[in-house]
Swiss-Prot record:
Comp. bias regions, Pro residues: 352-361
PROSITE patterns for the chain: NR_LBD, NUCLEAR_REC_DBD_1, NUCLEAR_REC_DBD_2
Chain positions of motif nuclear export sequence (NES2): 568-577
Classification via SUPFAM superfamilies: Glucocorticoid receptor-like (DNA-binding domain), Nuclear receptor ligand-binding domain
Native source species: Mus musculus
Protein name from the UniProt record: Nuclear receptor subfamily 4 group A member 2
Lineage: Eukaryota, Metazoa, Chordata, Craniata, Vertebrata
Length: 598
């Protein structure tokens, strides 16, 4: 049985269906890309003088409809399907022709070449009448060719196959063509070409002309040819690998040193402040553990070991001393009552309360210490010009000079102590009347307390606020027996080994306390509680505080003693007023009258 063999050409690996090429050998050949009119619209240029038409050419859908019934002239084609490179045969039988003879050179095919999937049978249909009467087709040039029968068999089989393709979904034609760019082409040189409306020229071209697209050759011997669509050089793998290997700079990390400060202790990265100083997490934890555990360190060198990021763990003594030197405050370390609560304050009560005074700075004890240091004379600038340790001095001179000296020392201390009181956090926020009342009521107590803390009772040296140093015997005629009580109190106070922080709190508590006649006693009480808590925290975690559980009680017990000494001072002033040897200054007289207990 005669059969027509269809050639299956090999397509390059990875080729898409849109890139497969079809070639039809005959005078009436059509490209398979034009067989999908729902995706491609084109115009036809009628340039062949042998074909004339009075009206426009029929639409492409008309041609396709005619394929279903048959044409008098069926376009011959050679259908080339780029699949796998294997050969298969299409069997044609029961073909009845009208006045046509099979060409003698058609090679017979054997049954062994039939595909295993089965045979495909086709039958011709009756010739239809052209839909356009004025469209004339020349028949004689096609059938005069001796090999026209062979071409007709091929055309009929390919045409029927194209009709079957119309019944199945057709992938959209690709209007873009891609070319392999030569090696070394830069990535930015990629181009894309898009052709305009497709034209179908009717001029015949020489048979056997060839076109090369993307390295594949196909023959276009018929008058209808598909022009090249466009070129788009492909991106070479070498350039792509270079782009992938290029390292993109990453954005700066959140914890980079450029966005943060440095630790004041070791120089490591520090995000925020801890205990009053910008420090790293390591130095913060070291300082916290040292203060809470009251740790004692010993330097094995000369107490000047380098403390940096690399050597900060070598000497704990020098590291802790540097923490204190840069300003870290021990009193800010959390107490036992706040451990495990992340420093959260108690929840606010639902009931409204009176507005509290502005919160003092976090380092309250540091402010108290600073105020005390600023209000005391430096040890290098003391005035020893009037100091005499001769016991006969108390017998020399008259009482007027000693009484005037007594008044001068009191008035000179009053201005200095007032300046110290104004530096206490929260004191300046109180009403002015309450400030004056607290200061005047506690002036003599503060005078005695500060004098007792500065003086050296063993040597009998009394150091006053203005820097004047006098011997105890030089003050007996002016101060009377009051000076002996002051020296005794100084001796007991210094035996307690009170540090400057605890003493600053005691001095503040001597003034900020409950007094008769306060306008806002609640605010004074709140400020007093803050100072008491600050003193308690300091004593609890201070060196030696844990070994002396009654140390805080002894410190607070000095306040009633000051009240007794203040009463003795008022009695001395009252006696001098009665003696009337030297009139007291107005400020001392007012102080005496305002602070009388009766």
């Amino acid at each position: 049985m005669p059969c027509v063999q269809a050639q299956y050409g090999s397509s390059p690996q990875g080729a898409s269906p849109a890139s497969q090429s079809y070639s039809y050998h005959s005078s009436g050949e059509y490209s398979s890309d034009f067989l999908t009119p729902e995706f491609v619209k084109f115009s036809m240029d009628l340039t062949n003088t042998e074909i004339t038409a009075t009206t426009s050419l029929p639409s492409f859908s008309t041609f396709m409809d005619n394929y279903s019934t048959g044409y008098d002239v069926k376009p011959p084609c050679l259908y080339q399907m780029p699949l796998s490179g294997q050969q298969s045969s299409i069997k044609v039988e029961d073909i009845q022709m009208h006045n046509y003879q099979q060409h003698s050179h058609l090679p017979p095919q054997s049954e062994e070449m039939m595909p295993h999937s089965g045979s495909v049978y086709y039958k011709p249909s009756s010739p239809p009448t052209p839909s356009t009467p004025s469209f004339q087709v020349q028949h004689s040039p096609m059938w005069d060719d001796p090999g026209s029968l062979h071409n007709f068999h091929q055309n009929y089989v390919a045409t029927t196959h194209m009709i079957e393709q119309r019944k199945t979904p057709v992938s959209r034609l690709s209007l873009f063509s891609f070319k392999q760019s030569p090696p070394g082409t830069p990535v930015s040189s990629c181009q894309m070409r898009f052709d305009g409306p497709l034209h179908v020229p009717m001029n015949p071209e020489p048979a056997g002309s060839h076109h090369v697209v993307d390295g594949q050759t196909f023959a276009v011997p018929n008058p209808i040819r598909k022009p090249a669509s466009m070129g788009f050089p492909g991106l070479q793998i070498g350039h792509a690998s270079q782009l992938l290997d290029t390292q993109v700079p990453s954005p700066p990390s959140r914890g980079s040193p450029s966005n943060e400060g440095l630790c004041a202790v070791c120089g490591d990265n520090a995000a925020c402040q801890h205990y009053g100083v910008r420090t790293c997490e390591g130095c913060k934890g070291f300082f916290k553990r040292t203060v809470q555990k009251n740790a004692k360190y010993v330097c094995l060198a000369n107490k000047n070991c380098p403390v940096d990021k690399r050597r900060r763990n070598r000497c704990q003594y020098c590291r802790f001393q540097k923490c204190l030197a840069v300003g870290m405050v021990k009193e800010v370390v959390r107490t036992d009552s706040l451990k495990g609560r992340r420093g959260r304050l108690p929840s606010k009560p639902k009931s409204p309360q009176d507005p509290s005074p502005p919160s003092p700075p976090v380092s309250l004890i540091s402010a108290l210490v600073r105020a005390h240091v600023d209000s005391n004379p430096a040890m290098t600038s003391l005035d020893y010009s009037r100091f005499q340790a001769n016991p006969d001095y108390q017998m020399s001179g008259d009482d007027t000079q000693h009484i005037q000296q007594f008044y001068d020392l009191l008035t000179g201390s009053m201005e200095i102590i007032r300046g110290w009181a104004e530096k206490i956090p929260g004191f300046a926020d109180l009403p002015k009347a309450d400030q004056d009342l607290l200061f005047e009521s506690a002036f003599l107590e503060l005078f005695v307390l500060r004098l007792a803390y500065r003086s050296n009772p063993v040597e009998g040296k009394l150091i006053f606020c203005n820097g004047v140093v006098l011997h105890r015997l030089q003050c007996v005629r002016g101060f009377g027996e009051w000076i002996d009580s002051i020296v005794e109190f100084s001796s007991n106070l210094q035996n307690m080994n009170i540090d400057i922080s605890a003493f600053s709190c005691i001095a503040a508590l001597a003034m900020v306390t409950e007094r008769h006649g306060l306008k806002e006693p609640k605010r004074v009480e709140e400020l007093q509680n803050k100072i008491v808590n600050c003193l308690k925290d300091h004593v609890t975690f201070n060196n030696g505080g844990l070994n002396r559980p009654n140390y805080l009680s002894k410190l607070l017990g000095k306040l009633p003693e000051l009240r007794t000494l203040c009463t003795q001072g008022l009695q001395r002033i009252f006696y001098l007023k009665l003696e009337d040897l030297v009139p007291p200054p107005a400020i001392i007289d007012k102080l005496f009258l305002d602070t009388l207990p009766f």
